[in-house]
Amino acid sequence: MKNIHKIFSPEKKGKEKISVVTCYDFSFARILNETEIDSILVGDSLGMVFQGNTSTLPVTLEEMIYHTKAVRRGAPDKFLIADLPFLSYQTSIEEGIRSAGKIMKESDCDAVKIEGGSEFICELVSILKQIGVPVMGHLGLTPQSVHVFGGHRVQGKGEESSSKLLKESISLFESGVFSMVLEMIPAELGKKVSQEVGVPTIGIGAGSDCDGQVLVLNDLLGLDINFQPKFLKKFSNLHSIVKEAIADYDKEVKSGEFPGKDHSF
């Protein structure tokens, strides 16, 4: 079930969509393992969703390994991708190799994801592929560069910006990524990139013409009522469900109804 060539086959382009979910913990991963989801991403977005930070920048490689190990234990049958966090690969090719090797060896993930499409990143992708590390690319709004962008804004809107992103996507493809995430770019640009590159594109706010989609599990389940970006569809309202369950528990504890005979030894 974890065959990279089956899940992210270029032959799927334009035919069968790929479903990816971002997850950070054992309990949810165990549920995902029972579904038809194609792949799980352990994203450095855990810095915001799980830790409560305002960006992904504080996340460390050790924290990524910790969470990826937990997800792997819960989802042994899924193709598992782990983010390399900020400054774990940007300082040098050697550091990138060490970080990728460390997270793959210690967490048992199947691939790593890195952000950007510069000449340096493409060189790193090429070398990692040569030594046996599958790499997923990430273009558009790359959260590790949020301060450069001036916030979480749609990328690739102007002609110069869109041309640059398209060029980077082709360079990433030629460098050997097996897939690439396209985040918060115009739908038409997402379509164009998907047509130009020979590997599956996974969109998040990049339109319906990408070869697949990714959402954070907590977001699609509706756990955060305050988070509602345009690209997000909430498939449930767990915030209300969880809140009601806790209220019922609180009420029964205080009334003495719980624990009853059925819950006592």
Swiss-Prot record:
Its Enzyme Commission number(s) read 2.1.2.11
Q: Which domain of life is it from?
A: Bacteria
Q: Which UniProt keywords apply?
A: Cytoplasm, Magnesium, Metal-binding, Pantothenate biosynthesis, Transferase
This protein's pathway reads: Cofactor biosynthesis; (R)-pantothenate biosynthesis; (R)-pantoate from 3-methyl-2-oxobutanoate: step 1/2
Locations listed in the record: Cytoplasm
Q: Which reaction does it catalyse?
A: 3-methyl-2-oxobutanoate + (6R)-5,10-methylene-5,6,7,8-tetrahydrofolate + H2O = 2-dehydropantoate + (6S)-5,6,7,8-tetrahydrofolate
Required co-factors:
Mg(2+)
According to its UniProt record, this protein's enzyme class is transferase
Give binding positions for Mg(2+). 44, 83, 115
Quote the Gene3D superfamilies the UniProt record gives.
Phosphoenolpyruvate-binding domains (3.20.20.60)
How the cofactor is bound: the record states: Binds 1 Mg(2+) ion per subunit.
Q: Name the CDD domains on file.
A: KPHMT-like (cd06557)
Q: Which family does it belong to?
A: Belongs to the PanB family.
Known partners and oligomeric status: Homodecamer; pentamer of dimers.
Which PANTHER family does the record associate with it? 3-METHYL-2-OXOBUTANOATE HYDROXYMETHYLTRANSFERASE (PTHR20881:SF0)
Name of the protein in its database record: 3-methyl-2-oxobutanoate hydroxymethyltransferase
Q: Which organism is it from?
A: Leptospira interrogans serogroup Icterohaemorrhagiae serovar Lai (strain 56601)
What is this protein's gene name?
Answer: panB
